Structure formats: structure tokens, C-alpha cells
């Protein structure tokens, strides 16, 4: 049965997946949680009372066991919460299992709540309410893991907040244009903060506040107090603020820049006024420390412990000397955030590839990150990273996550390495495409702990849990194909801001559609052509030998990547009938994601071939009739690919959606694209004399 638009949101509100119990014997050294057991709640109306109710719901919904909640602690067969600050480092927790009691211990109530969620994880891996008689310890390696909403931009229903907390993530992000104002709508920040805090989550303000005054101008302190001081006076519950160049740039006096905000450098003709310099948001300006000092000062008058996170995303491509010079002068009582993989060059299938924006095709840290991580360590500045560890990137923009667990595990291992050598202590786990609980969040939660877990073993347990031990080898083969299909993707900006962003809804345009506008949901933050450009082009791909080799190499590589993804999806699809009904729906969604990614790669393959033939006509290169015939073949192949995508987006309403763009790749947009291409076939390509 086809889902309607936004039906996926109801799935995000399902904190506990139903009917996870399998019939199996109790193992040696295990106990069974039966209806004889009770959950002890403190009775103070606080976090652990809510956590106890959550645990009761888990056992009922997922395991089919009815447990009572009681204030009594003295009886046998009880599950109860303890606070023990001496357990270990901050936020450590333990599930201590004995014959007659399960103690959920944390260094504070939030940690004890995580112990409760760990108990759920242990039972999920067992596929039964069975627990091993042991101490199950966790000590998170990151003090901060933050995500935007995957439900809808800046929208966090209570159940979704609970689901995020179950992922081991402890902070959420909200875009801020003013008090109670995000880019798309108004709402109460204080209400969100209270609801998030109620389930153990902090809230960070992602600043869109406009910094129009230089910090040494007269009245600067009052101006910034009217922005950041005002925000934190009205909403003192914000844990901190994210400051990234493109969103908070100020009129710097650094001579390497325009000295103007980006939009202030656009003339009446729509062209840049100063053309040979970057805007201050895209350069490590020498006066950013001065700007940070005033922003920090006005915020901390209202909240002394506010976490001021300064993110160097926009100038990672600038020379290392200038970047590190800025870090040498930053205040040390802020947090420095550096993007993990960007601006790194490599080869994929012999073709040059560059991680121009968020990607898991480069799971390792880039030179930009490494240089700034070591600089932060030298200065004793707390180090965060933009890692996308919740599982989504711009490799494909309208899927809930990229199901490449091998690549994600490799990234997680490198994150651990930099935790150990440079003190990496925070992670932005996703940008505005948000967080969807998945096998990737299960993997990160289990792996990001101090006790040096075996990531490969964790991954194998996840695959066994979700696909069955009898299907383990086939599942491994399929996910290895997904890993290889994404890893060998040739990353280019024009693809991430083109067909990879919206998938098979991306149109192949010829000559009459040069000003085409992508259809979008009215009021969406990044809808239409704002962050997806339908005018696909290289600078001079047919005349420049290097660009032509890049285009040809990309065509070849994308064909291989698409084939791998579709083959992996076919293997998993063949396993669906062997799974219990309770597992089949989620497994089918993974199949759909894999196939959708494959069809997105195939669309991108066709886009590049189409562009090559189109430009051959422009330059009168070769046999015109042959080029026209090839364009017709490509158009028919892409129409078939788009039609094959329709059942995927019908089955899973999350495919084709991204919170900031809303729906850009769903059935309506795919059908629109097919109509565009059918018109080209019936009109432009049917009249070759034109």
C-alpha cells in the first residue's frame, strides 16, 4: 500500500518497534524478564520517572511483556535506577544484571536514562527479554552529539525527541533568526527547550543572526547584545550556539576579503561589486577573534556556561597558514568545530574526486581537519567535528540515511583516533537533513564508548539481528556492494548540487528549458533551484582535455556505482520473504533506499552522457544525426529509470524528502520530470532541423 506524503513522520514517532521478540531458549548465564518483574520509579516526576514509563512501553510493545511500575525498591525481581557519580567519567552508565535485580546506574539522571536505553538495546540484540548476568558498561567518548530534525525543519514532536535520545545523541539544533523565529516559521524556543530537557537533550541555537557591525565600531556591544544577549535573555535554556561563517559573517576589516556581507556585495545588475575577493564568511579573517569576544561576552552575561561553537566550514579550502593563524588567536574558552572530510582529493576508479561537501565517499579525515585538530590541541581548545555520524550526507540528498555500514564504521574508527590523539570531544552528527534512527545510529551508539569495542563484531550483530543468522553472509555481500558503490562515487560539486541532491526527479534539459524552475513545496527553506541547480554544465568539457577526461571518467564510474547499488538491493530483496513479518517492513525500506540510491546514480550517469551529447551539438562536433539519436536513447533510458523509481517513493514517503527542501524527489516531481523529457522527445528531438 502506497504511503501518502509525510507518512514517514508517523514512523519517526514510533520510539519502540513492535513485536521484536523471537521464540528462542534462554541461554546459559542469562535471566529472563517476565511479567513477574517490576520497574521502580523515583516518583518525583523527573526524567527517570519518564524513563521508567518509556521502559515499560518498550517491554510491552517490543517484547510483549507487561511490567508494573512501583515505588517499592525492596522486593526481588526489580529493575531500578541508581545515581553514582563515582561510576566513571561524566555521563558513564551501567546495566548491572543479577538473578533478582537489574540496576540501571548512571553518573547523573541523564546517564541513568541511557542505561535504560542500553537495556533495550541488549534485549533487541537478543531478540528476547533476556539479559546476561554481567556488568554492561558504557562511557561515551563525546560530550556532545548534536543533530537537526529529520521530521521537518526545526520541528521536534515529543516522541521524536525520545527516539533521538535512544540513539545516544544528547543535543538537538534549531535554526535561529530571532527570538522564537526560525527561517520558515515561528514557535516557542522555550517550549522546545523544556520538552527536549525533559528527555535528557540539550538544545543549541544555530545562528542565522545578521552581524552588520564590526566589533570595534561605536555601539557594537549594544548591537550584539540586541542580537545574542537578547536571545539568551529570552531563552536562557539554550545550551550554546553554533557560529559558522556563511550564516554569521560580519563586515571584517581583513584586506583579503570584500569587507561586506555576501548579499551586500551584489549590485543592482545582480553581479558582484567586488569580484576578486571572498566575503568575510569564506575567509579566516584576522578579526574573527575580536568578533567572537563580543559575542561571547554578551551571551555569557546571560548564561555563563554557554557553549560557543565556532565552525571553520567555509574556509577549509584556504591556505593552511592563514587558517592556523586564526586558530592561534582564538579564545580558548570556546569550542572549535572542523568539518571532517572536506576539500580532500583522491582517485575513484582512476578518476579525480574531491570531497567538496559532506560525503561518506571519503570516510577518513582530510588534511584541513587534521591541521586544525592539531592546532586546537596545541591551544587546548575543545575540538568538535562535523562528521554526519547519524548516517546522512549530500552524496544523495533525499534519503533518510546512506546504508553503507562499512564506510560509516571506518569513519567512526577515525573519529575515535582523533578523540585519542587530539581530544575530539564533540560531533555534529548531521546537517539540516536531520536524523533518522537506523542501523547506522545503532552502530555509532554502540561504538562510541571508551571500552574499545570491536566495531566489526557490533556490525555483525546488527546484521544478524535485522536479517537473521541464516542470511548473514548474503547480507554482508549486499552491504559490501553498497559500501563499494558509494565509495567509488566520483564527487563533483555540480553533481551534489544537481542530480545527487534530488535523485531521479532531476530533469535532463536541452535548449528550450534553460530557465527551468524545479517544482517545490511553497514556503520550504531551500526549495526550487536554491540548492539544486537544473542547469548542468562544465566550464569547457569538450574543449579542455582534462575536463573531458573528468566527464568521461565520471560517466564510467557512475555506471559501475549504480550497478553495484542495484545488485546489492536485489540481493537484499531476495531475502525479504525469509524474514519474520515483524522485520520485513524495515528491511524492505533498506532495500528501497539502496535501490533509490542506485537509480539516483543512474540518473547522474545519464545527466553526464546527455550533457556530452548536447554540447557536441553546440560545438558541431561529429555526426549530428548520431548525437540526436543518442540523446533519444538516453532520454528513453532515463524515463524508464524514473518510472522504476515510482514504486520506491510510493512505498517509502521519506524518499524524495529532505527537511529544508521538503519534497523535491517524490512522485509528483518525478512525473513532472518525465513530462519534461517526454516534451523534449516529442518536440525538440522530433524536429532535428531546429
Regions found by a protein language model. Name each.
Residues 2-140:
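Contiguous, structured surface segment used for ligand recognition
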Residues 53, 57, 61, 117, ...:
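Solvent-exposed, polar/charged alpha-helical surfaces in well-ordered, non-transmembrane soluble domains
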Residues 147-148, 152-310, 321-328, 335-338, ...:
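Substrate-binding cleft of carbohydrate-active enzyme catalytic domains
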Amino acid at each position: 500500500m502506497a504511503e501518502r506524503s509525510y507518512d514517514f513522520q508517523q514512523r519517526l514517532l514510533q520510539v519502540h518497534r513492535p513485536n521484536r521478540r523471537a521464540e528462542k531458549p534462554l541461554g546459559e548465564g542469562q535471566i529472563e524478564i517476565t511479567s513477574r518483574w517490576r520497574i521502580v520509579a523515583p516518583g518525583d516526576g523527573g526524567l527517570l520517572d519518564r524513563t521508567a514509563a518509556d521502559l515499560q512501553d518498550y517491554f510491552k510493545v517490543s517484547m510483549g511483556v507487561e511490567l508494573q511500575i512501583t515505588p517499592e525498591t525492596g522486593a526481588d525481581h526489580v529493575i531500578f535506577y541508581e545515581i553514582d557519580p563515582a561510576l566513571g567519567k561524566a555521563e558513564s552508565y551501567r546495566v548491572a544484571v543479577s538473578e533478582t535485580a537489574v540496576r540501571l546506574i548512571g553518573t547523573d539522571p541523564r546517564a541513568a536514562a541511557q542505561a535504560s536505553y542500553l537495556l533495550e538495546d541488549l534485549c533487541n540484540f537478543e531478540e528476547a527479554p533476556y539479559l546476561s548476568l554481567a556488568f554492561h558498561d558504557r562511557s561515551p567518548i563525546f560530550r556532545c552529539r548534536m543533530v537537526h530534525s529529520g521530521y521537518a525543519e526545526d520541528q521536534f514532536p515529543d516522541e521524536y525527541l525520545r527516539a533521538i535520545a535512544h540513539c545516544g545523541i544528547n543535543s538537538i539544533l534549531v535554526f535561529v533568526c530571532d527570538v522564537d523565529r526560525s527561517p520558515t516559521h515561528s514557535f516557542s524556543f522555550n517550549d522546545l527547550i523544556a520538552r527536549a530537557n525533559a528527555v535528557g537533550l540539550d538544545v543549541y541555537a544555530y545562528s542565522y543572526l545578521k552581524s552588520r557591525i564590526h566589533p570595534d565600531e561605536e555601539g557594537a556591544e549594544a548591537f550584539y547584545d540586541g542580537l545574542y544577549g537578547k536571545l539568551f535573555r529570552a531563552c536562557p535554556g539554550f545550551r550554546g550556539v553554533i557560529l559558522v561563517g556563511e550564516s554569521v559573517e560580519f563586515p571584517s576589516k581583513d584586506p583579503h576579503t570584500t569587507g561586506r556581507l555576501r548579499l551586500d556585495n551584489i549590485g543592482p545588475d545582480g553581479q558582484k561589486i567586488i569580484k576578486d575577493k571572498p566575503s568575510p564568511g569564506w575567509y579566516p579573517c584576522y578579526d574573527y577573534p575580536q568578533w567572537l569576544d563580543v559575542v561571547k561576552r554578551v551571551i555569557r552575561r546571560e548564561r555563563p556556561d554557554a557553549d560557543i561553537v565556532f565552525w571553520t566550514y567555509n574556509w577549509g579550502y584556504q591556505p593552511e597558514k592563514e587558517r592556523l593563524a586564526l586558530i592561534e588567536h582564538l579564545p580558548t574558552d570556546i569550542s572549535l568545530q572542523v568539518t571532517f572530510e572536506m576539500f580532500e582529493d583522491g582517485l575513484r576508479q582512476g578518476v579525480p574526486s574531491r570531497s567538496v561537501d559532506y560525503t561518506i565517499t571519503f570516510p577518513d579525515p582530510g588534511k584541513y581537519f587534521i591541521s586544525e585538530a592539531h592546532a586546537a590541541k596545541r591551544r587546548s581548545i575543545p575540538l568538535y567535528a562535523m562528521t554526519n555520524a547519524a548516517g546522512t550526507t549530500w552524496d544523495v540528498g533525499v534519503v533518510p540515511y546512506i546504508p553503507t555500514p562499512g564506510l560509516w564504521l571506518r569513519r567512526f574508527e577515525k573519529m575515535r583516533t582523533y578523540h585519542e590523539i587530539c581530544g575530539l570531544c564533540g560531533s555534529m552528527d548531521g546537517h539540516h537533513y536531520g536524523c533518522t534512527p537506523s542501523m547506522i545510529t545503532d552502530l555509532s551508539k554502540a561504538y562510541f564508548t571508551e571500552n574499545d569495542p570491536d566495531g566489526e563484531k557490533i556490525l555483525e550483530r546488527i546484521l544478524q539481528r535485522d536479517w537473521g543468522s541464516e542470511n548473514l553472509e548474503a547480507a554482508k555481500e549486499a552491504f559490501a556492494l553498497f559500501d563499494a558503490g558509494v565509495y567509488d562515487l566520483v564527487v563533483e560539486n555540480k553533481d551534489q548540487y544537481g542530480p545527487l541532491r534530488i535523485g531521479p526527479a532531476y530533469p535532463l534539459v536541452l535548449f528550450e528549458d534553460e530557465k527551468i524552475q524545479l517544482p517545490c513545496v511553497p514556503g520550504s527553506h531551500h526549495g526550487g533551484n536554491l540548492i539544486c541547480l537544473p542547469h548542468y554544465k562544465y566550464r569547457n568539457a569538450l574543449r579542455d582535455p582534462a575536463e573531458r577526461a573528468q566527464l568521461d571518467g565520471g560517466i564510467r564510474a557512475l555506471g559501475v556505482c549504480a550497478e553495484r547499488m542495484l545488485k546489492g538491493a536485489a540481493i537484499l530483496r531476495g531475502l525479504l520473504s525469509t524474514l519474520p513479518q515483524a522485520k520485513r517492513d524495515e528491511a524492505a525500506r533498506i532495500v528501497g533506499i539502496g535501490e533509490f540510491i542506485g537509480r539516483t546514480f543512474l540518473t547522474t550517469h545519464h545527466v553526464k552522457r546527455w550533457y556530452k551529447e548536447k554540447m557536441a551539438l553546440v560545438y558541431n562536433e561529429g555526426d549530428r544525426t548520431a548525437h540526436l539519436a543518442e540523446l533519444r536513447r538516453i532520454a528513453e533510458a532515463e524515463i524508464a529509470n524514473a518510472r522504476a523509481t515510482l514504486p520506491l517513493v510510493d512505498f517509502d514517503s521519506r524518499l524524495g524528502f529532505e527537511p529544508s527542501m521538503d519534497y523535491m524527489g517524490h512522485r509528483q516531481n518525478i512525473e513532472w520530470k518525465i513530462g519534461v523529457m517526454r516534451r523534449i522527445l516529442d518536440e525538440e528531438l522530433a524536429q532535428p532541423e531546429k
